[in-house]
């Protein structure tokens, strides 16, 4: 299971939230709070099979390594993130903020009768310029609207709010406050209102 984009579901990512039991799991830089790092885990059965083939480490076909493998800064970042961010308490707060974010965005979308949607996965929320929200990669690609995406990013940046690049998405963090979410909601409402007024 690749948790690169689903780790925001909770302390154990979508794997724990949905009760999955994968043979392998990968986690990207979210496990280090954005510092370049990653981790993977294996089921006992798969780990035994991998360990039985230590001869593969002698060739370029297997093994784990690289300039970031065991890097002390990456390891320290992962430890801090595991201890202070990827916890039940932190996720309860971050998910509540994402709920608030979604409610504010949805209110603006509904007020203007726009064919948009907002999707949430734990502490992550993303505006989609289609309704209902896409449920597959193909549908997501077909619904992509680069002009609306660019407009929203620039309009919000001009109102002192930054969204995640390449998506109209926000990720709540332990540092995010209700005031931050409310500031976004006001800026989003103003930007969307200006877009609707311009026709």
What do the predicted segments below correspond to?
Residues 1-199:
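Conserved N-terminal phosphate-binding loop of PLP-dependent enzymes in the Aspartate aminotransferase
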């Amino acid at each position: 299971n690749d948790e690169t984009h689903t780790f925001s579901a909770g302390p154990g990512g979508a794997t724990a939230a949905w009760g999955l039991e994968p043979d392998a799991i990968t986690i990207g830089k979210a496990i280090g709070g954005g510092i370049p790092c990653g981790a993977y885990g294996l089921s006992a059965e798969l780990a035994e099979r991998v360990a039985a083939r230590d001869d593969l480490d002698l060739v370029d076909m297997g093994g784990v390594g690289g300039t970031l493998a065991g890097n002390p800064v990456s390891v320290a970042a992962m430890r801090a993130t595991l201890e202070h961010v990827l916890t039940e308490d932190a996720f309860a707060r971050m998910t509540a903020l994402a709920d608030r974010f979604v409610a504010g965005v949805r209110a603006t979308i509904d007020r203007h009768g726009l064919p948009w949607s907002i999707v949430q996965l734990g502490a992550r929320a993303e505006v989609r310029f289609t309704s209902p929200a896409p449920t597959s990669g193909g549908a997501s690609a077909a619904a992509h609207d680069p002009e609306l995406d660019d407009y929203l990013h620039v309009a919000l940046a001009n109102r002192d709010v930054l969204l995640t690049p390449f998506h109209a998405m926000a990720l709540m963090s332990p540092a995010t406050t209700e005031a931050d979410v409310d500031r976004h909601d006001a800026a989003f409402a103003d930007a969307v209102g200006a877009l609707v007024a311009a026709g």
